[in-house]
Regions:
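Leucine-rich repeat
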Residues: 1-311
């Protein structure tokens, strides 16, 4: 949305006049979005808002809060955004859901959150009981908010304190999902913790798993390597009969990459249709690269499907 304000107003008025509108997709290009009157819309089933704009919380979240409350059939919500003007522009999942009647919760099946404060409690949990797909990236944790408080003026610090109460750590989110027995079929995340592995080890039936920038919190390589071994040896086999997509993109070579330590576990995943994984260069004999590639590919060539491989 980089059009002049008058054009944005015309577009929003036109959208509001479409009674059968169910799927809304908006890409913010960095320009002001004060004319984005999401509160004018109702009864949507899918909402996707990507990109960024100044005053995101004021111009987007406030209207989105009303739109969600007026869309009881909403099943798909994608509200990832890439940047914010300042720390006060942080938004929370509570800010989206607290207008929805508790006795008539949403039936969300697909949720994408990027750069949000997330806390799963009596306000937010009812709306994700039926969730099947979750993408959780750049989760804003309480300590990130706290680190800004000391440097801010008292009024700003008080605002940040209120925001922090709607944040929880990534580990707390996965622990709550496990305790509430919410069994996701599709997961995409960028932080791997013991709590995450405990969650996906608590059930079977995962179909799509994407792990990006796979590393441990605090950039502890040793811890990350231990988590990788646990994932391949103990967790992945739990979903070997259901997994169709596995995408693992670590930030450095190590145990998350393909090698002799995880080949057996990967070969158990007989329903894989899409596999993307890095290969440890230290395990490749340069003069025999073609032999190494064949050794990686051969177990997958005999699967019932013809999987897409990205190595």
């Amino acid at each position: 949305m980089n059009d002049p304000e008058w054009a944005q107003i015309v577009v929003m008025d036109s959208l509001a006049s479409l009674p059968a509108l169910e799927d809304l997709r908006i890409s913010l290009g960095g320009a002001p979005a004060s004319s984005l009157k999401l509160e004018l819309l109702t009864n949507l089933r899918k909402i996707t808002i990507s990109g960024y704009c100044p005053n995101y919380k004021q111009d987007v979240v406030s209207g989105l809060h009303t739109l969600i409350a007026n869309s009881p059939r909403l099943t798909y919500l994608d509200v990832g955004y890439n940047t914010r003007a300042n720390v006060l522009d942080v938004s929370s999942l509570h800010g989206l859901f607290n207008g929805v009647p508790r006795d008539i919760p949403l039936d969300l099946r697909h949720l994408v959150l990027r750069n949000w404060c997330v806390r799963l409690d009596e306000i937010t949990l009812p709306h994700i009981r039926l969730l099947e797909s979750l993408s959780l990236h750049l989760n804003i944790e309480p300590q990130q908010i706290a680190s800004h408080q000391a440097a801010e003026e008292p009024e700003t610090s008080h605002t940040l304190s209120r925001t922090a109460q709607y944040c929880s750590t990534t580990s707390e989110i996965w622990t709550t999902l496990r305790e509430e027995r919410i069994k996701l079929k599709e997961i995409s995340t960028d932080e791997i913790t013991p709590a995450f592995l405990e969650y996906i080890a608590s059930y079977s039936g995962l179909e799509k798993l994407t792990l990006t920038f796979t590393t441990a919190r605090e950039d502890d390589v040793y811890t990350s390597e231990k988590l990788a071994l646990k994932f391949y040896n103990e967790v992945l086999p739990m979903h070997a009969q259901s997994l169709t997509t596995l995408d693992i993109c670590p930030i450095y070579e190590g145990k998350w990459c393909f090698g002799s330590h995880n080949a057996a576990s990967l070969h158990l995943c007989t329903k894989l249709q899409n596999l993307r994984i890095h290969i440890n260069s230290e395990e490749i004999d340069r003069p025999k690269k073609d032999v190494v590639v064949r050794s990686v590919l051969s177990p997958f060539l005999f699967l019932p499907f013809s999987p897409y491989l990205f190595l």
